[in-house]
């Protein structure tokens, strides 16, 4: 439908790879309009080299490369950590968190440039098409969205290469990786290609952020993470901003082989997909933060938050970052973090991240109450009345059903 709708100026989510380079040219040919290429720097490092020059040569009227690393860490990764967001109990949502930020930044560029349409290179089988488009629909509902992979007749990579050569688009001369990869400040994800066999172990050469646990240092390393209201603010006593926290933890945890996960997940579109992830810094933050909550949040609130964390993760995974329900869930999470302040001691050793200590000035843990020795604060005789009342439904059900 978008193909038949006239547009004047398009903002394209651009990576500089084969797909988005072809899309850039295809958009100009198909719509006869100006195309602005947009790239978000969210920690992909060397992938940004030469991108502006390549975009202009491929036909973009302008190329925006925005450094969004601090915003990504502060406004997306850290709130996810506060909410203990983990999809299907395994995936820490590195890619899912990046997409709404990119959509938000593209909308801002579109408003500045007077663009009336957006385009992206996500395929019709994946989750990213949903995340990008829900972001745009939530922030700029009047804009047109163009998804070339759902429109054009190209069947795969060979068709794209043939089109690129016919249009003079530079085709990468390096050998194609036997899998797809997406990198940002939170993680690197690998999927497709040789990873589509869920029984086949990934090649060790694939991993870029983490050392093989077998080759990690033979001595453990200890870290102390300071938190204020659910956010990590210092490592080993040194104050840092969220970007510095992520970069530091990625380096240290990666050295010890921490943060690898190999899973088969359920995509929003109904397909099961194998993903291999490296999330070194995020793994440390997730474990440390959840542990600190255990001494700073009361039982009932914590149990409710644990249930809500599942919904929170699903909202992120499914692209609902800007929804009303997400705002309500985040408001609850923010309230629970008022007293999540303290220090967590972490031990890193050959792929394992262990919490070995925690303390807080506002801790709800009372050793005098918890002790198994004789104490005055807790009268064990009081437990009998509690059990009688608490167990009454079970007792009565059993008694009456025996009649």
Curated annotation (Swiss-Prot):
Pathway involvement of the protein, from the record: Amino-acid biosynthesis; L-arginine biosynthesis; L-arginine from L-ornithine and carbamoyl phosphate: step 2/3
Positions that bind L-citrulline: 91, 96, 127, 131, 180, 189, 265, 277
Protein origin, superkingdom: Bacteria
Catalytic activity, EC: 6.3.4.5
Annotated positions binding ATP: 13-21, 40, 121
One term of GO molecular function: argininosuccinate synthase activity
Keyword Nuclease: no
Binding site for L-aspartate: 123, 127-128
Name of one Pfam family that matches: Arginosuc_syn_C
Keywords in alphabetical order: Amino-acid biosynthesis, Arginine biosynthesis, ATP-binding, Cytoplasm, Ligase, Nucleotide-binding
Catalytic activity: L-citrulline + L-aspartate + ATP = 2-(N(omega)-L-arginino)succinate + AMP + diphosphate + H(+)
GO biological process: argininosuccinate metabolic process; L-arginine biosynthetic process; urea cycle
Subcellular location: Cytoplasm
Cellular component annotations (GO), alphabetically ordered: cytoplasm
InterPro entries, A to Z: Arginosuc_syn_C, Arginosuc_syn_N, Arginosuc_synth, Arginosuc_synth_CS, Arginosuc_synth_type_1_subfam, AS_cat/multimer_dom_body, Rossmann-like_a/b/a_fold
Keyword Cell cycle included in the entry's annotation: no
Sequence similarity: Belongs to the argininosuccinate synthase family. Type 1 subfamily.
Quaternary structure, from the entry: Homotetramer.
Annotated protein name in UniProt: Argininosuccinate synthase
Gene from which this protein is expressed: argG
């Amino acid at each position: 439908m978008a193909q038949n709708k006239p547009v004047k100026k398009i903002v394209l989510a651009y990576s500089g790879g084969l797909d988005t380079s072809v899309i850039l040219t295809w958009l100009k040919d198909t719509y006869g309009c100006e195309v602005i290429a947009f790239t978000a720097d969210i920690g992909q490092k060397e992938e940004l080299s030469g991108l502006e020059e390549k975009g202009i040569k491929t036909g973009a009227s302008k190329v925006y490369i925005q450094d969004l690393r601090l915003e990504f860490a502060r406004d997306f990764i850290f709130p996810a950590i506060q909410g203990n967001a983990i999809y299907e109990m395994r995936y820490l949502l590195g890619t899912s968190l990046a997409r709404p930020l990119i959509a938000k930044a593209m909308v801002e560029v579109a408003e500045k440039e007077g663009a009336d349409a957006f385009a992206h290179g996500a395929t019709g089988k994946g989750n990213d098409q949903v995340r990008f488009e829900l972001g745009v629909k939530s922030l700029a509902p009047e804009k047109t969205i163009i998804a070339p992979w759902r429109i054009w007749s190209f069947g795969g990579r060979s068709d794209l290469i043939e089109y690129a050569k016919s249009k003079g688009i530079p085709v990468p001369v390096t050998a194609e990786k036997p899998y797809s990869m997406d990198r940002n400040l939170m993680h690197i994800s690998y999927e497709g290609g040789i990873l589509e066999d869920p029984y086949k172990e990934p090649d060790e050469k694939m991993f870029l952020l983490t050392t093989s646990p077998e080759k990690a240092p033979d001595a453990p390393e200890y870290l102390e993470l300071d938190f204020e209201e659910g956010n990590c603010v210092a490592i080993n006593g040194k104050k840092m901003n969220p970007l510095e926290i992520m970069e530091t933890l990625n380096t240290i945890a990666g050295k010890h082989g921490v943060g690898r996960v190999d899973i088969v997940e359920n995509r929003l579109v109904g397909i099961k997909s194998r993903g291999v992830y490296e999330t070194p810094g995020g793994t440390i933050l997730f474990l440390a933060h959840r542990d600190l909550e255990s001494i700073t949040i009361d039982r009932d609130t914590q149990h409710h938050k644990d249930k809500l964390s599942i919904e929170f993760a699903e909202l992120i995974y499914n692209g609902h970052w800007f929804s009303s329900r997400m705002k309500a869930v985040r408001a609850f999470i923010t309230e629970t973090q008022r007293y999540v302040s303290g220090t967590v001691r972490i031990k890193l050793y050959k792929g394992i991240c262990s919490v070995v200590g925690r303390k807080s000035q506002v801790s709800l843990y009372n050793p005098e109450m918890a002790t198994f020795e004789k104490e005055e604060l807790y009268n064990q005789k009081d437990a009998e009345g509690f059990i009688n009342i608490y167990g009454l439904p079970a007792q009565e059900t059993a008694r009456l059903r025996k009649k």
